[in-house]
């Protein structure tokens, strides 16, 4: 007697995972809805590719001046570009041809790369958030080992994505949609009927639910730390307005009284650091908004026997499967929105140091150290003028050059403020 046939599932309209195939696969599809899918995927492909290439170009022109935050954004752009090229593009071609056109090896490779890009993009965002958590809540640890703590956080998402995507290679294969029909497609194959439900639930937990829980916890702690920081600075300001005869160092010491040891030496959070926290927070919100419909529909498709399937004409169901890819479109534009000053600076980088004489400005600004403000001399070159910005301190001892370098690495953009006048 032959063994029980394996349970099969077909790719979803999103193409990354699958939904159960409960209809006769030879009936074709809704061509009008397919045109809408193709239009959406083509738009996502253009926006995601163009936006992430622009970010890579901007950061590439920064050269060795990239901060640790820029390194995370660089790799996030690479993962999002991977989503565009290895997930959206194959699915676009697949929707155009309807059936998968390629060998069994190509089928497995496409499915592997599609999920790898999802894992890498999600975990890179998670690593970037963890870096902001360490920079805000544990600044001393970041100061002691600035580079050692950065590269493992960047390498871990790529390694985890490569490992966790391996099941796709064994689940998907090129096979006949109906035995003896001669029509081939890249389908998932499970021996047990509960296989799709278990696999979809696992991927939803690994790519969406657990990362969102960690992201929420990190930002809860970050917001709590910023709130304590603002409370301390407000109290210090009130004491100064009362006319207490205190020097800057003693005022800072009073301000840090009662704070935990990890922030007692660095009692204020710089504006640049807060800006990077805001940027990462907006990227996280965009990620949740884009991927929540996708994974909700995936879970619905395997846990509800009456859910629509891949050949359904339910427009809302089909479009929801495509929304997750919008996250890779939003990320580069969010980054450029928070760092709009980098675009003209990068484009004018090669025309630097020409024209008139530099003009020097003395500028007093709040540093990331309340009691250890450091003098920074930075410059940026524009088409016509060169501006030098000085952050001066009148009540602090000079810091060693090595310490200053560490501070700049931890703070993302540190306390440098450059502009083109």
From Swiss-Prot:
Record function comment: Receptor for arginine vasopressin. The activity of this receptor is mediated by G proteins which activate a phosphatidyl-inositol-calcium second messenger system.
Originating organism: Mus musculus
Record-linked InterPro entries: GPCR_Rhodpsn, GPCR_Rhodpsn_7TM, V1R_C, Vasoprsn_rcpt, Vprs_rcpt_V1B
GO terms for MF: vasopressin receptor activity
Segments for region (Disordered): 399-421
S-S bridge residues: 107-186
Classification via Pfam families: 7tm_1, V1R_C
Residues linked to a glycan: 21
The protein's name in its UniProt record: Vasopressin V1b receptor
């Amino acid at each position: 007697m032959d063994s029980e046939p394996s349970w099969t599932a077909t790719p979803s309209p999103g193409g990354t995972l699958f939904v159960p195939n409960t209809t006769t696969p030879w009936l074709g599809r809704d061509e009008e809805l397919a045109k809408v899918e193709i239009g959406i995927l083509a738009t996502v492909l253009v926006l995601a590719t163009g936006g992430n290439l622009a970010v890579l170009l901007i950061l590439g022109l920064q050269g060795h001046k990239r901060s640790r935050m820029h390194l995370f954004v660089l790799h996030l752009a690479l993962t999002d570009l991977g989503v565009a090229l290895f997930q959206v593009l194959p699915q676009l071609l697949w929707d155009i041809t309807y059936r998968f056109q390629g060998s069994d090896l190509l089928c497995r490779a496409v499915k592997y790369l599609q999920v790898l890009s999802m894992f890498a993009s999600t975990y890179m965002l998670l690593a970037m958030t963890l870096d902001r958590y360490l920079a805000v809540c544990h600044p001393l640890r970041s100061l002691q080992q600035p580079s050692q703590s950065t590269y493992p956080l960047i390498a871990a998402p790529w390694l985890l994505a490569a490992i966790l995507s391996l099941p796709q290679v064994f689940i998907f294969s090129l096979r006949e949609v109906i035995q003896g029909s001669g029509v081939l497609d890249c389908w998932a194959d499970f021996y047990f009927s509960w296989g799709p439900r278990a696999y979809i639930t696992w991927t939803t937990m690994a790519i969406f639910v657990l990362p969102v829980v960690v992201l929420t916890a990190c930002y809860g702690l970050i917001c709590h730390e910023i709130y304590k920081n603002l409370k301390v600075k407000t109290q210090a300001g009130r004491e100064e307005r009362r006319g207490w005869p205190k020097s800057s160092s003693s005022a800072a010491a009073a301000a840090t009284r009662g704070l935990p040891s990890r922030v007692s030496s660095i009692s204020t959070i710089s504006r640049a650091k807060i800006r990077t926290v805001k940027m990462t927070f907006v990227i996280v919100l965009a990620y949740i908004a884009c991927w929540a419909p996708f994974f909700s529909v995936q879970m619905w498709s395997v846990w509800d026997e009456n859910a629509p399937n891949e050949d359904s004409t339910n427009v809302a169901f089909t479009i929801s499967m495509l929304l997750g890819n919008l996250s890779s479109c939003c990320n580069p534009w969010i980054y450029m929105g928070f760092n709009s000053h980098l675009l003209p600076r990068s484009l004018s980088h090669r025309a630097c140091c020409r024209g008139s004489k530099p003009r020097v400005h003395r500028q007093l600004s709040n540093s990331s150290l309340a009691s250890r403000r450091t003098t920074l001399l930075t410059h940026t070159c524009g088409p016509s003028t060169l501006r030098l910005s000085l952050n001066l301190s009148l009540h602090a001892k000079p810091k060693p050059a090595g310490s200053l370098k560490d501070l700049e690495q931890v703070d993302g953009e540190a306390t440098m403020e450059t502009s083109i006048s």
